[in-house]
A protein has these predicted regions:
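Short beta-strand segments
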Residues: 3-6, 37-41, 102, 125, ...
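Amphipathic coiled-coil/heptad-repeat helices and related helical stalk/stem segments
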Residues: 18-21, 108, 142
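Accessory alpha-helical/coil subdomains and C-terminal extensions
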Residues: 46-135, 218-242
Length: 242
C-alpha cells in the first residue's frame, strides 16, 4: 500500500491535524487495503478518486463517486479494496503532450483548435453529462474540434465539471455528436485521473481501438464500470441539453 497524508495546519501548532493524520496513515498502511490512498481527517480515500475540496477545513478531501476505503474513529474499519488480477506491473512511461481544456461560456474554438498540432491527447471538462456549445449559428461550436482531433488521431476524453456522477455521452445531442466523431467517455473519472490515464494510454497503446478500450475500462478503480452504450455508442434519440 501507498498512503499519502498531510495537514491543514503545521505540526508545530497546537491545533494541528498533522499528528493524527500521520498516525492514521501509518495504521492504514498496516491494516488497510493494498492501494494508493489518501488518509485525511480520519478518512481513507482511494487516491485516484479523491479531490481537494476545502482549503480552510480539516475535512479537506472528498471522494464523491467512490465509497471510503476506511474510517478511523474510536475503531478503525477498512474496506477490502480492489481484487488484484494477476501480478502488479509498474507502468513508468507517460506521454506528457496532453492538455486539459475546461469548457466555459464564450470559449473561442480557435484556441483549442490551435493546440491540436501541439498535443497528442486532450481531456475536455464539459458541462453536466457531457455538454458543450454545439450550435454553429452562434459561432462557438466545439464540434469541429472533435472532427479535427479525430483526423489527427488525437484522442479527446470527455469528463464532467460536476463533482458527483459522471459523463453520459449518449444522453444529449451534443454528447452523441461527440461520440460520432470519436470522443471517449471519461465516465465519472476526475479530470486529474483522466489526464494521467490518457498519458499512460498514449504511451503504451498506439492502436486507436486498443487505446480507447484502455481509457474507458476501469483499471485500478479510477472509474465506475458502465454499460457499453455509455462509453461508445450514441443513443438513437438524444435530448437537447437544457
Amino acid at each position: 500500500p501507498v498512503v499519502m497524508t498531510g495537514s491543514q495546519r503545521p505540526l508545530g501548532e497546537v491545533r494541528s491535524d498533522a499528528r493524527l493524520n500521520l498516525i492514521d496513515a501509518v495504521l492504514s498502511a498496516l491494516q488497510g487495503p493494498p492501494e494508493v490512498s489518501i488518509c485525511f481527517d480520519s478518512h481513507l480515500y482511494r487516491g485516484n478518486r479523491a479531490r481537494k475540496v476545502k482549503v480552510a477545513e480539516y475535512d479537506a478531501f472528498d471522494s464523491p463517486n467512490c465509497p471510503l476505503l476506511g474510517t478511523l474513529g474510536v475503531e478503525a474499519t477498512f474496506a477490502p479494496g480492489l481484487r488484484q488480477k494477476g501480478p502488479r506491473r509498474l507502468r513508468e512511461r507517460l506521454e506528457s503532450r496532453v492538455f486539459l481544456l475546461k469548457v466555459f461560456p464564450g470559449l473561442d474554438p480557435a484556441l483549442p483548435m490551435a493546440l491540436l498540432p501541439q498535443v497528442r491527447g486532450l481531456v475536455l471538462e464539459a458541462y453536466g453529462a457531457g455538454n458543450y456549445p454545439l450550435d454553429p449559428t452562434l459561432g462557438h461550436s466545439l464540434l469541429p474540434l472533435f472532427r479535427e482531433a479525430r483526423a489527427r488521431d488525437v484522442p479527446v476524453v470527455v469528463v464532467s465539471q460536476a463533482h458527483h456522477n459522471g459523463v453520459d455521452l449518449s444522453l444529449y445531442e451534443s454528447g452523441a455528436a461527440a461520440l460520432a466523431e470519436g470522443a471517449l467517455s471519461g465516465g465519472d473519472m476526475t479530470p486529474s485521473a483522466a489526464l494521467v490515464k490518457l498519458m499512460q494510454g498514449l504511451a503504451y497503446h498506439q492502436d486507436r481501438e486498443a487505446r480507447a478500450r484502455f481509457i474507458q475500462t476501469p483499471i485500478v478503480g479510477e472509474m465506475t464500470d458502465r454499460p457499453s452504450n455509455v462509453h461508445g455508442t450514441p443513443a438513437k434519440k438524444s435530448r437537447r441539453a437544457r
